[in-house]
Design a protein with these regions (language model features):
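RNA-contacting regions in translation and RNA-metabolism proteins
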Residues: 1-238
Length: 238
């Protein structure tokens, strides 16, 4: 029976690059890896700046050199993080430096089409469910917007006490094609939780953004070079 592996993890290192890009010795690795998680959690769940949660942060990439830590935020509304004359981004950069005790170089990269990012779609659905919107209508609207934005397919799955029902259940809707086992397919995945009065509702979203072009793969460039040579054509002597 086929198992539902995480589409991003399945393609990482083959078609998709890593979100943390650095090298460390065995002694340093155990300290640096939790540091990356601390950076991501601090930005996404900032104790004071609630507007960061509205900025539509899709992913946070971390690169390390000997001198500094480079943090790249991919978000839909960069103005909420940059602030007036760049004051907010300087403040956040200072907070991150105090948090990890290293020099931080913070960069913001705007997402051109947030409707195609599965994490942002999942967070939008969760936000609507928390406002007690109809779950079926919310799913349908989100799927229509994603397909209109140019997606090849989308799948949305909700799990929990849907509509305030006494018994938790799972409901899913699919539009278009979602080839999860095809590595060339650009499948994005996102997860969010809706905090409702009846309990938590889990939201999972899969978005098919098309196929990777031949030069798009980040870490699979040498896969063709390492391929075994084909056997010579067999000849028959009379």
């Amino acid at each position: 029976m086929g198992q539902k592996v995480n589409p991003i993890g399945f393609r990482t290192g083959v078609m998709v690059g890593w979100k943390s890009r650095w090298y460390a010795s065995k002694q340093e690795f155990s300290g640096l890896l939790p540091e990356d998680k601390k950076i991501r959690d601090f930005i996404k769940r900032h104790p004071k700046k609630t507007q960061y949660r509205q900025a539509g942060i899709d992913k946070i990439e971390v690169e390390r050199t000997r001198d500094e830590v480079k943090v790249v935020l991919h978000c839909a509304r960069p103005g909420l993080i940059i602030g007036k004359k760049g004051q907010e981004i300087e403040f956040l950069q200072g907070e991150l430096q105090n948090l990890i005790g290293r020099r931080v170089n913070l960069k913001i990269q705007e997402i051109s089409r947030p409707e195609l990012q599965a994490q942002l779609v999942a967070e939008e659905i969760a936000e609507q469910l928390a406002k007690r919107a109809s779950f079926r209508r919310t799913m349908k609207r989100a799927m229509e917007q994603t397909m209109e934005a140019g997606a090849k397919g989308i799948k949305v799955q909700l799990a929990g006490r849907l509509g305030g029902a006494e018994m938790a259940r799972r409901e899913k809707q699919i539009s278009g094609s979602i080839p999860l086992s095809t590595l060339r397919a650009k499948i994005d995945w996102g997860f969010a939780e809706a905090m409702t009065a009846q309990g938590h509702i889990g939201v999972q979203v899969w978005v098919n953004q098309g196929f990777y072009a031949m030069g798009d793969d980040k870490d699979g460039d040498d896969a063709e070079e390492g391929k075994a040579s084909k056997k010579p054509a067999r000849t028959y002597k009379r």
